[in-house]
Amino acid sequence: MEGIGKAYLDYNATTPLDPLVIGVITESLKCEWGNPSSAHSLGKLASDRIGRSREQVAAMINAHANDIVFMSGGTEANIVALQSGLNSITKPNSKECNIVLPHVITSNVEHDSVKNYLSVQQDCGKIDLSFAQVDKASGQLRPESVLSLVNNRTCLISVMHANNETGVLMPIMEIGQALKALNVSRSQNNLPKIYFHTDSAQSLGKVKVDVKQLEVDYLTIVGHKFYGPRIGALFVKDLLTQTPLVPLLQGGGQERGFRSGTENTPMIAGLGQAAELVVQNLDKYMEHMTRCRNALISNLKDQIHDIRINFVVDPRLPNTVSLQVPQNVTAQKVLENCNGKIFASLGAACHSNSQKPSSILMASGLSPEEAGRTIRISIGRTTPDSEIEFAVKVLTEACKRA
Ligand SMILES: Cc1ncc(COP(=O)(O)O)c(C=O)c1O
């Protein structure tokens, strides 16, 4: 984009479609438009395509294809995972039904689709909700901060894999392994199983995601964050035998009854292709984003005094830079001074109309004033070096003028 005097650095908000994904979607729109439930050959063509995509998406996270259910996106996948985990304890005749109030644990930096759904359940008196706090200063979550909140009524834990604003990776594997051991002893003591969900919207296509290593029961997949279409999927461990899935949509019984509504074959085809690209190229993507990020940080530091890079911790996403501009300047002003040449954001895209400093950044240790001086820059897998150089030049001038 720098060739036309612009740099897109907002890949955590959304990514463009990869050209190969566009190709597969286009082909599918033309040839696989039959209803996947139809018994004739056009239906079979579409349902075969969906089966192939399911395998591609499963391969991206080292899962079994049977454990993938296609959905409209990350918000739906998060809500279905949460309501399913909760249902395990509230359904009539379940052995845990004597539990008066199910207890759920989440972190204080989750995406709104998790935070707001759980907060509403709490406000309705349906659950008791605890928030594990990330460490102020680092934005990191210690496994003990989550595990120490577990009690005899806990039935569900939801912690995101990577934070969309800070880029900090959360200790999902450590929590998952601890829960696996804990669930063995809970079962012996007739206590409810604790289901574990992670929202992987921001980590797929940026770091390795392996559901077996992470030891999760549910994992949210969002296509438009890894150069795929604007749909998603939910991984449910041993879906048919072990982990409950409560459908949000009832109807014709598509997706084996777990998500009714005629399948969006072309977009599902695109999601499969996007997943396959991640399988083939993840190391290359990671290497490229890390190099661009490091170049951006060192060039910005050379050019602008008094800037700070927040949340430089290990592990973190290779593509996200939380840039704190110098004192007496606001991030809003700096972005305005870029005159539309830099596409970056002050925080999550869904909060772009808010005048308030980001609650995620404040929960992660920044003061309101520091949060108001923070720009989120997120790099893509194909961002050219020249676009990084262009962004440094424009941001430097914008800070000086501000
Ligand atoms: C961490 C995280 N979870 C969930 C979502 C929701 O995805 P969607 O808006 O596609 O439903 C997003 C999107 O910004 C996200 O960043």
What do the PLM-derived regions correspond to, one by one?
Residues 1-402:
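Pyridoxal 5′-phosphate
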